[in-house]
Amino acid sequence: MDRSSAVGGCGGGGGLGVGVVTSSATALGPGGLTNGGGGVVSGALNGLEAMSAESTGLCLQDLVSAGTANGAGSAGSAESATTTSTALSSGSTGSSTVNGGGSSTSGTEHLHSHHSLHDSSSSVSISPAISSLMPISSLSHLHHSAGQDLVGGYSQHPHHTVVPPHTPKHEPLEKLRIWAETGDFRDSHSSMTAVANSLDSTHLNNFQTSSTSSISNRSRDRKDGNRSVNETTIKTENISSSGHDEPMTTSGEEPKNDKKNKRQRRQRTHFTSQQLQELEHTFSRNRYPDMSTREEIAMWTNLTEARVRVWFKNRRAKWRKRERNAMNAAVAAADFKSGFGTQFMQPFADDSLYSSYPYNNWTKVPSPLGTKPFPWPVNPLGSMVAGNHHQNSVNCFNTGASGVAVSMNNASMLPGSMGSSLSNTSNVGAVGAPCPYTTPANPYMYRSAAEPCMSSSMSSSIATLRLKAKQHASAGFGSPYSAPSPVSRSNSAGLSACQYTGVGVTDVV
């Protein structure tokens, strides 16, 4: 006896009728399902009760797939699996066709016809009877092992195990629940693919598809809503900020334009000579004229009051600068006088350097004649050291009158202090002082100031000295630019040899 299961969707009531009928005939009506030909309905109802009692999940595929057939046919025992196409509709009366007679010897053949359920996003309507028998949680967690309860035979899917609906061991569903709670769905298709790969079976029921799709849609809507809210807030903030910024920029540009207009360089005012003369005259009298005075000056000079005010301001600045420079110059001059001028204006610290200089003590200085080389072997002082010893104590000057005259001539040509000292020494020499012009015989031997000038030691006469002087002058060693000696200006006929020697020394030097 062949048995097949048929599922019919009732259009009017929207319920789902389940029954086991024979292969002879099947009649589906709005009220449910009627069987003919001695079909058995109690098996299906008992299977539903047992399934609800065990609280196991019901898979929609088991309702559609065929059970085991144990009947004696003409050809022997055969198992015919008939499938019905599930029609889900809301308005039209649903009908289900039973395909019988399809026998197969392969045993348990599982034909799937519910793949269209995965593409649909609408939920399946369930009759109140099934919904009362089964909890909602069990409907969302269905397994293919329910066929054993319906038919009483062996399980068509031995690789599936009956798992309680909510067990923490089912990791893929736990991950799905976590993803659903967090709403982390970047792509619904990729998430569905990951879940399908993680599950043991690639066939998901309609309830799972609808729930995941609804959750993903809900999360997507939530994200879209948040995104739209953020965009609107950002847009409004940008608009508000830009609205605030625009008047700021316009208000900032306006003062800039005003400043540019104010800072435009005006043309310099060129004053005439008459205007400058009038302004200078007024400035000499009053450096700070008031408003009325400036207006009068402006009328006289044919200028504006502003130009007159600016001119006085600049003129006062120029006047202050000049006054400041003058004060600085005066202070600098005072500092110079106090710091350096007093040193130059003070008398010499040691007047005895020049006033009390011993001009009569010339014997301490070496003679320049002894150090100068001459091309001829002349030793004018060698004759003085010769062996002529005259004991005539003769002074350098013949008479006192001539000595006084010479001293007066020297004093007239020299400065006051030096002339006075020279005249004093000459007077002393006229009285009986030794001759100050005596040159030592040896340049490294000095005569003492107390030693008298002995003319007896000289071996040559005045004529011999004059002859040597002429020879020296004719040789070209005399300097034409040398100043004449004051002694030579005086009466040279009455000069002694000592004085003549001094004249020669002056010419050579």
From Swiss-Prot:
Residues 70-98 have a biased composition (Low complexity). The lineage of its organism: Eukaryota, Metazoa, Ecdysozoa, Arthropoda, Hexapoda. A motif (OAR) lies at residues 460-473. Appears to control physiological cell functions rather than pattern formation during embryogenesis. Residues 227-242 have a biased composition (Polar residues). Belongs to the paired homeobox family. Bicoid subfamily. The keyword Acyltransferase does not apply. Keywords: Activator, Developmental protein, DNA-binding, Homeobox, Nucleus, Transcription, Transcription regulation. One of its GO terms (biological process) is regulation of transcription by RNA polymerase II. GO terms for cellular component: nucleus; transcription regulator complex. GO terms for molecular function: DNA-binding transcription factor activity; DNA-binding transcription factor activity, RNA polymerase II-specific; RNA polymerase II cis-regulatory region sequence-specific DNA binding; sequence-specific DNA binding. A motif (Nuclear localization signal) lies at residues 464-470. It is found in: Nucleus. Residues 70-125, 148-171, 204-273 are annotated as: Disordered. Residues 243-258 have a biased composition (Basic and acidic residues). This is Pituitary homeobox homolog Ptx1. Residues 262-322 bind DNA. Residues 259-269 have a biased composition (Basic residues). The keyword Transcription regulation applies.
